[in-house]
Regions:
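Short coil/turn motifs at secondary-structure junctions
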Residues: 14-16, 45, 57-59
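An amphipathic, aromatic/His-enriched active-site/gating alpha helix that lines ligand/cofactor pockets
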Residues: 27-39, 55-89
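Short, surface-exposed ligand-recognition loops at beta-strand->loop->(often short) alpha-helix junctions
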Residues: 11-23
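Glycine-rich beta-strand-turn "strand-cap" elements at beta-sheet edges
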Residues: 1-6, 11-12, 38-51, 74-96
């Protein structure tokens, strides 16, 4: 049985690239959603850091997304628009 995998990325847009970076994140999120790979939520912290929360459908879909040419193009573009602060590839839920 597959379960969603939570990933979190914290990033800041490079100077002068905020609008293009957010547009690229939106494009990437759309590609991943249309491919059935994941669903995303984007948050902005008051000091300018962005937090991208991604729920991968499964480990298999995450691997498949890494091979998707449309997604690869967006990830490559983002590399020139943002600086990654922190990435959590897989977070496990702890029951409370």
């Amino acid at each position: 049985m597959s379960h969603e995998i939570l990933s979190v990325a914290v990033f800041v847009p490079l100077e002068g690239h905020e609008q293009s970076a957010i547009a690229t994140v939106r494009e990437l999120s759309s590609v991943l959603a249309k491919g059935g790979y994941s669903r995303d939520i984007l948050y902005r912290e008051p000091q300018g850091e962005y937090v991208l929360v991604r729920y991968w459908k499964s480990d298999d879909t995450r691997r498949a997304a890494l091979e998707d040419a449309e997604a690869q193009r967006r990830w490559a573009k983002l590399a020139h628009e943002i600086r990654i602060v922190r990435v959590y590839e897989s977070l496990e839920e702890i029951s409370l």
